[in-house]
Structure formats: C-alpha cells, structure tokens
Amino acid sequence: MRTSNYLLSTLKETPNDAEVVSHQLMLRAGMIRKLASGLYTWLPTGLRVLRKVENIVRQEIDNAGAVETLMPVVQPFELWEETGRSEKMGPELLRFTDRHVRPFVLSPTAEEVITSLVRNEVSSYKQLPLNLYQIQTKFRDERRPRFGVMRAREFCMMDAYSFDIDKAGLEKSYQAMHDAYCKAFDRMGLEYRPVLADSGAIGGSGSQEFHVLADSGEDLIAFSTESDYAANIEKAEALAPAVERAEPTQEMTLVDTPNAKTIAELVEQHGLPIEKTVKTLFVKASDEIDAPIIALIVRGDHELNEVKAENLPQVASPLEMASEEEIRELIGAGPGSLGPVGLELPFIVDRSVAVMSDFGAGANIDGKHYFGINWGRDVELGQVEDLRNVVEGDPSPCGKGTLMLKRGIEVGHIFQLGNVYSEAMNCSVLGPDGKNVILEMGCYGIGVSRVVASAIEQNHDKYGIIWPDAIAPFQVAIVPMNMHKSERVKEAAEKLYAELTAMGIEVLFDDRKERPGVMFSDIELIGIPHTIVIGDRSMDEGNFEYKNRRTGEKTPVAMADIVEHVKSQLK
C-alpha cells in the first residue's frame, strides 16, 4: 500500500477528550474517528488491525469445532420477554418500535436469538453437540461511554453458543472454547490471564474472564503467587482467618464520638487501630426475610464486595444501599454511628469480623460508639459469610501461596449457562430414550474491538504504538529518503516494494513528499514492526537500514540481503 493512495490521517497533538493511552494513540495514529458519544468510524489503519484480530479469532474458534453464522443486530423484543431479560438488562438494552409499532431491540448479545434458532432447527440428540458463533456488531446504550473503543456503545464482538445433551458435554465444549481463547490470545502476542468470574446478568454457573494485563485496566485481578489460581476481585474468595478469636481483655464502654463520622476519623481521633473497627452497611433486603433492610458488617480496613453481597439470598438484587432516611426511621441513628450491639434488624458478619475481639463499632446513637465489643458476651455472632474484597497478601483460596493484585482489561468471557435460557425458551431435543431433554448451553464472547485497544495499552512507548507482529496493520514500512529528488533511491524503493508485496508481505510504502522526520514519526506512531530506510548515504555503502520498532535497534543490511533479512525478522 502506497501512502499516496491511503488515508493515513495521523495527528501530531493528543485530543483533549482522550483519557487512556489506547484512545489517544488510536486517534493520533488515524485508526478511529469519533462520530458521536460511544460511536466510532474505523479508518483504514484501524480496520486492518480489527480484521486481523477477527481472523485469528475466527481461525481458532473454527478449529475448536464451532460453525460460523450471522444473526440480525435488530431483535424482536418478545424474545427478550421470554427469558425475562427485557427488564434485567435495564437501560443498556436499546428499545425501539418500527413503523407498525412492533417493539424491537438492538442486540447487546444473542442468547435469545440463537436459542430460538436451535429450538426450531435441532430436534434430536444425534445433531449434537453443536456450537454456533458469529462476529457481529453489538450495541449497548452505555450511560457513560469512555476510553474510546474500550467502552463504546457500538462494538464488534465474537459471540458463540454451544448446545449439548448433558453437563458432561457442556464441560467438554466449555474446555474446547477455553483452549481456543488461549490459542487466539497467544497468537496475538498478548499477556493475559483467564480468571474465575461471576456470571452476572448472563446467568449460569461456571464462568471465566480473560483479562489483558495493563495498568489502565478497570478490573482488579487476584493471582496466587504459587499456583495458576486467578480470579477477578468480584469472585476471589477471602478465606476465614486461620486464627481463633482471642479472649476479651476489655469491658464494653460507650464513648462520645461527635466528630467521628467515618472510620478514618474514628481511628485518628480516638487512637483505635483500624483493624479493630467495623463498618456496618445497610442494604435493601429480599423477600427471604421479614425485614426491609439488612446489615452487612465488614472490618474497617476492608471493602464490601457488592457481588458477593448481592448473591446472598437475604439481599435484594440488584444491590441497593438503604438511604439515610430509611436507616434513621428504623434505627434512630445515621451512617457513621451504626453497629451490631442492640441492633434489632438481621445482620450478616464477614469472616474477618467473626474472629475479632475488643473491637469498636457504632452504638446506633448519633455521635456515640462502643469500644471493647466482644462476640457472645455483648452481641450474638449469628450468620457469617465472605463479604469482602480480597487484599494483597491474603492466603490464596487454592491453598498455595498468597494473593497479589494486578489490573486487567476484560477482553473475553466464557459461561456454562446450563439450562437457564433453554428451559425458559423450551429448547429441547429427543434424547436416546425418546424423551424430551432440555439442552445444556454455553456462551462465549470476545470483544474484538476491545482487544485492539487492549493490545495498545500493553504495547506502546512515548513515540506511539508497538504492535505485535500478528495484528500489526502492516508488517513492513519502506521509508525512502528524498525519493522525489533521488532517482536511484526511488528505483530501489520501488523494486523492494514490488519484491516484498509479491511475496505476500504487507508493506506500507511511504511515497509522500514529506520531510524524513515527519515520515519517521508517522511510521513509529502507527507502530509498524519493521522499517526499511533507503537513502543515498547508506546506498553509497551498499546498504539499507533496518529498524526494529520494538527494540529500536538499527541495523545496516546489504542491499542484496534485505529481503532475506526481512523474512527472517517476520514472526
């Protein structure tokens, strides 16, 4: 490809509204342009990368035995009503009506559509297992689109759906897709981790996310220092402390704390160690209990894990914190002065809190706390659960090593759905015994456009993008110095361009009438892995200059050897 025939569209300055590196560089490198909030046009350079990611994903998913299909972006609303997700998805599900006032949605995912297809097309266990996938545009009406294509409203996604006669078949399909994901991300040259995850709005049981490791990642991931265990912060289990609760050494005393409305203020003003304090958080209760709200108690230096809390049967879903007005009406005190002693509402205690002694908590009286609280003596312990986020140094749930935390960007997710959707939509086949069997489903997604941004977050320097070879927009750049003034430079560049392209190598030939500095800056910004510089000075010595984008190393290479040298560098 010649730059004279190409829409390069690079920018010198970083746009003000671009927050993360990938967004900044995708705009500056001419990969995308913003059309509206969360909506982007993919320019030629960006599209080349996107297609390469798509092709790698397609090849590995094909190799796993899945079959490609293509489903409509527009879906009938009634399908979403069948599964009950029409309300669960909330405002992210964009609804509209056609000219006949029939309700539709823009597809954020396709479980309903694929289940409807399979229930109409598959009737016997002999047609199973079956795994269908598509690479298609999706739309989620994000409340706050940000970070460019990382959290856009419209995005490209690979979504696959497996159908099996039993759980053993589902587990086999799930493992095949897990392995396919690993092969795809390995080929892309990404540093990633598959981690245990919560199933969230999709539903089902087993679930893993695939995260590209990057400091800009929105998600926290917990890893064992001595095993392959990894889980996102929502799923990572905080084990019960391996110590017994100490015997009381203090009497419970009521203390005036008028200026201590937070844990930090309590610690600072009264000298109480933060690990000797607890936070009492009130959330809306479910119909499982005869109370409007329920208290969740965690240690003062720990954070409530909202996903773990929401998964408790006594807690309403979605999780909703009780308002100060509701708390005051029931207890007579406000946030900052709440605790378990004398509390006449149900409460659940975190595992770390259950082993505490001589601790401090609100007295359920404004401006007062109890110090020296002990379970059993001053208040009954009751129900104990894992309620908190893990912290670095916690013992790993696998029993090996401790946990360390890193940030990651979720680029893929796999679920063992079971029969959540197939049962709701009556998707069944005749089994070997002639009886109807509800199918076991798996669903699998890769955010193709998000992979592009994630790769940049992991591969860049102050000059621009450093693409892994497999997903670079071009493999090689040819930069001729003053080509329009030197006939021999032009001839050498044209000859090399013809040779490399004839071999199937993707080349960007910078034939612009531009200063060398501008040409070099653009090539580095775009991130092409291998650059060949052709100039009169090096040709006088019988050489071209080869430059590796990742290492920055420059190497003189004999003109006669340049093609073989380039071939040896390509991965």
Curated annotation (Swiss-Prot):
Its Gene Ontology cellular component terms are:
cytosol
Q: What is its main location?
A: cytoplasm
Q: What are the subcellular locations of this protein?
A: Cytoplasm
Q: Name one Pfam family in it.
A: HGTP_anticodon
Q: Which reaction does it catalyse?
A: tRNA(Pro) + L-proline + ATP = L-prolyl-tRNA(Pro) + AMP + diphosphate
Q: Which UniProt keywords apply?
A: Aminoacyl-tRNA synthetase, ATP-binding, Cytoplasm, Ligase, Nucleotide-binding, Protein biosynthesis
Question: Which Gene Ontology molecular function entries are recorded, alphabetically?
Answer: aminoacyl-tRNA deacylase activity; ATP binding; proline-tRNA ligase activity
Name the Enzyme Commission number(s) assigned to this protein: 6.1.1.15
Q: Which SUPFAM superfamilies match?
A: Class II aaRS ABD-related, Class II aaRS and biotin synthetases, YbaK/ProRS associated domain
The broad enzyme category this protein falls into is ligase
Q: Which InterPro entries match?
A: aa-tRNA-synt_IIb, aa-tRNA-synth_II, aa-tRNA-synth_II/BPL/LPL, Anticodon-bd, Anticodon-bd_dom_sf, Pro-tRNA-ligase_IIa, Pro-tRNA-synth_IIa_bac-type, Pro-tRNA-Synthase_IIa_type1
Which GO biological process annotations does it have?
prolyl-tRNA aminoacylation
Q: Which family does it belong to?
A: Belongs to the class-II aminoacyl-tRNA synthetase family. ProS type 1 subfamily.
Q: Which NCBIfam families match?
A: PRK09194.1, proS_fam_II
Q: Which HAMAP family match?
A: Pro_tRNA_synth_type1
The free-text domain remark for this protein reads: Consists of three domains: the N-terminal catalytic domain, the editing domain and the C-terminal anticodon-binding domain.
Share what the entry says about its subunit structure, partners included.
Homodimer.
The protein's job, in short, is: Catalyzes the attachment of proline to tRNA(Pro) in a two-step reaction: proline is first activated by ATP to form Pro-AMP and then transferred to the acceptor end of tRNA(Pro). As ProRS can inadvertently accommodate and process non-cognate amino acids such as alanine and cysteine, to avoid such errors it has two additional distinct editing activities against alanine. One activity is designated as 'pretransfer' editing and involves the tRNA(Pro)-independent hydrolysis of activated Ala-AMP.
Q: What is this protein called?
A: Proline--tRNA ligase
